[in-house]
């Protein structure tokens, strides 16, 4: 039996809506990473982007376990000497709650050129509404 390899013309993408309300950050991010990579499909091919578009709503209502709300810090660097910037989880939640889910999912993708293309299929919104109604997205029930 030959190994199946998906072709670009055979890719069928769906739009899915995920509600992040009262979901644990890491557990939700793993499921989203699986969806945007396409690993939930039987036609999964590691070298092809066969995943679905994922719209995450209610990012401001995500929760973290333990004491991460007080201890978690996000780092970025300006590439200048002494340019390390730190942002606490609480500050990030108040200013840009959508970035919390974005960074969690991005950290679960492989570090290669394909992942930079895959992460563009993730759309995160802090509130209940999103501008992708014309794609008629399906509601995805989060496991767990």
UniProtKB/Swiss-Prot annotation:
Q: Which GO terms describe its biological process?
A: negative regulation of translation; translation
An example GO CC term for this entry is: cytosolic large ribosomal subunit
- Extract the InterPro entries matched here: Ribosomal_uL13, Ribosomal_uL13_bac-type, Ribosomal_uL13_CS, Ribosomal_uL13_sf
Which PROSITE patterns does its entry note?
A: RIBOSOMAL_L13 (PS00783)
Spell out the molecular function terms from Gene Ontology: mRNA binding; structural constituent of ribosome
Q: Which UniProt keywords apply?
A: Ribonucleoprotein, Ribosomal protein
Q: Which Pfam families does this chain map to?
A: Ribosomal_L13
Q: Which family does it belong to?
A: Belongs to the universal ribosomal protein uL13 family.
- Function, in words: This protein is one of the early assembly proteins of the 50S ribosomal subunit, although it is not seen to bind rRNA by itself. It is important during the early stages of 50S assembly.
Subunit record text: Part of the 50S ribosomal subunit.
> Protein name, please?
Large ribosomal subunit protein uL13
